[in-house]
């Protein structure tokens, strides 16, 4: 929590006593950094190691030594931005400890999406996972992360309409201008960056394969789905035209 607020606001108060009658003053960034570092370093040896070589298992959602070490890595990697000090050596030190198994067995999964899957408690790539249960807080993650990042009627393409239509709010930053030329700025343009590696399996069009399996990570082009009348396509919210997703923003109806 402190690290997230520190990243967002930078000058934050440090509160170690509760209750208190005085409004705490803001702390200098270096003081906040040192406080977070001390908390993590003191907690690390007191936490449990990961015991399984088949994911976090029953420890899913519990802070372990590996997860704590990962927070230290994040802290040190951001030190140059947060306190204008280079902590790369410290970050590498704890990365090596995680890789070498000092805090339990961790490894890169053989599937890129395994750490994000519904059964990620079996993934050795996962350092920490926030637990959830259906009917609990899962709706917040589903709604903000998925239901707001897809076209209005794309639930038909997904093959899952139990929760109604999508409510699009976010989209990837386009990489091409109206004339089809790539923008000259370096940041963003995620699709253009992925296209530099055509063998990357994540570049495939997202498709629900059934049995809790899927492929790809992007939506682009036409979005077909099957009905009793044959193949149909996702349209605009009012059904006026067939939707065709491209790496541009503009009105392209009736164009190539």
Please report, for each region that a protein language model flagged, where it lies by residue.
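Elongated scaffold/linker segments in the mid-to-C-terminal portions of large proteins
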Residues: 106-256
């Amino acid at each position: 929590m402190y690290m997230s607020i520190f990243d967002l606001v930078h000058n934050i108060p440090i509160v170690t006593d509760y209750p208190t009658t005085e409004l705490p003053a803001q702390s200098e960034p270096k003081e906040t950094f040192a406080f977070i570092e001390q908390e993590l370093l003191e907690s690390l040896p007191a936490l449990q190691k990961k015991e399984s070589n088949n994911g976090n298992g029953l420890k899913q959602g519990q802070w372990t030594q590996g997860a704590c070490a990962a927070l230290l890595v994040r802290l040190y990697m951001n030190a140059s931005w947060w306190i204008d000090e280079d902590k790369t050596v410290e970050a590498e030190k704890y990365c090596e400890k995680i890789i070498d198994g000092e805090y339990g067995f961790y490894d890169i999964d053989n599937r890129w999406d395994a750490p994000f899957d519904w059964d990620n408690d079996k993934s050795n790539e996962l350092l920490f996972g926030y637990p959830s249960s259906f009917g609990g807080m899962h709706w917040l993650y589903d709604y903000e992360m998925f239901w707001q990042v897809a076209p209005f009627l794309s639930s038909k393409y997904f093959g899952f309409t139990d929760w109604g239509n999508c409510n699009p709010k976010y989209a990837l930053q386009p990489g091409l201008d109206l004339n089809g030329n790539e923008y000259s700025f370096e940041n963003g343009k995620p699709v253009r960056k992925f296209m530099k590696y055509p063998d990357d399996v994540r570049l495939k069009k997202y498709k629900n394969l059934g049995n809790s399996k899927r492929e790809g990570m992007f939506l682009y082009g036409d979005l077909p789905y099957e009905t009793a009348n044959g193949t149909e396509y996702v349209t605009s919210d009012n059904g006026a035209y067939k939707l065709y997703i491209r790496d541009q923003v503009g009105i392209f109806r009736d164009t190539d």
